């Protein structure tokens, strides 16, 4: 899971990672399989409600949060560089509802684009664009109406952007 803006003051982004086997140690060098890059995870965290604490070690079954500078996506794998492993992907569901979404205030375009892209990277919505079109408006696809409500709420409360949503017929 990827979650943006867990701390609004810092606009941080946390990737939640389940340890599948073995032992994880703070500062351990890992391989991000999808990019092929090695990285050190220096500040893994355990989160409980609003509290965060640095974790020195984690074992199979534990879930830790790691700072994500935009490298991770849902379903990514990190492993010991000496023991590369690949998991099959996580299924995505075809959207059933579509809407054109745009910001009410054109001066909020940057916040709108960043918010929509981050929420899409978290897997809450899918974005569709027409070829050679900008980001003034986007077509958003969702599985259920609640996802539109989550999008509107998060854009307003986390990015200070109010949106106009025009539902599209399913075709």
Residue ranges of predicted features:
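Structural and coupling elements of P-loop NTPases
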Residues: 1-171
């Amino acid at each position: 899971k990827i979650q943006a803006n867990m701390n609004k003051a810092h606009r941080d982004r946390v990737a939640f990672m389940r340890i599948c086997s073995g032992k994880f140690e703070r500062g351990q060098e890992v391989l991000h399989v999808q990019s092929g890059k090695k990285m050190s995870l220096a500040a893994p965290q355990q989160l409980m409600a609003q509290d965060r604490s640095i974790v020195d070690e984690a074992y199979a079954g534990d879930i830790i949060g790691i700072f994500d500078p935009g490298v991770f996506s849902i379903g990514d794998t990190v492993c010991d560089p000496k023991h590369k492993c690949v998991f099959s992907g996580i299924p995505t569901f075809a959207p059933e509802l579509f809407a054109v979404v745009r910001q009410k205030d054109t001066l909020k375009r940057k916040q709108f684009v960043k918010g929509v892209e981050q929420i899409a990277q978290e897997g809450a919505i899918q974005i569709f664009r027409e070829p050679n079109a900008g980001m003034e408006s986007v077509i958003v696809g969702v599985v259920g109406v609640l996802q539109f409500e989550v999008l509107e709420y998060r854009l307003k409360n986390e990015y200070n952007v109010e949106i106009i949503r025009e539902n599209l017929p399913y075709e």
